[in-house]
Amino acid sequence: MEMDKRMKSLAMTAFFGELNTLDIMALIMSIFKRHPNNTIFSVDKDGQFIIDFEYDNYKASQYLDLTLTPISGDECKTHASSIAEQLACVDIIKEDISEYIKTTPRLKRFIKKYRNRSDTRISRDTEKLKIALAKGIDYEYIKDAC
């Protein structure tokens, strides 16, 4: 399965800055009924631990345009508490995805927009995103415009 363009467009426009890789994993499980093939322990450019999820030919972080660096086994010790915390969240999400979505307002909003927003409107938002990025316009402005 390829990365979903509608989902990416919404994540990068109307929901920019609101979602993380755990949210993306939950949305993929809810919308597409797919579980990740692999879990990758990573850090972002600021050295913050982030758990990433690998699917057939894309990662959850790609929906958010995050550049992550996988960490080695030795580095896992440094991030042990963050790893434990995020793995616990993954277990909670997987245990009852429907309940998790119902109790997370931003994910409920995302799914509602994903299901109800027309392809034309999402395409327009994606086009605005491309134009704005080419001109160097900030994501926050794009989010407000969509």
UniProtKB/Swiss-Prot annotation:
It is found in: Membrane. InterPro entries: Poxvirus_H7. Induction: Expressed in the late phase of the viral replicative cycle. It is a single-pass membrane protein. The keyword Membrane applies. Its main location: membrane. This is Late protein H7. Belongs to the chordopoxvirinae H7 family. It comes from Vaccinia virus (strain Tian Tan) (VACV). Keywords: Late protein, Membrane, Transmembrane, Transmembrane helix. Contributes to the formation of crescents and immature virions (IV). It comes from the Viruses. The chain crosses the membrane at residues 10-32. GO terms for cellular component: membrane. Pfam families: Pox_H7. The keyword Transmembrane applies.
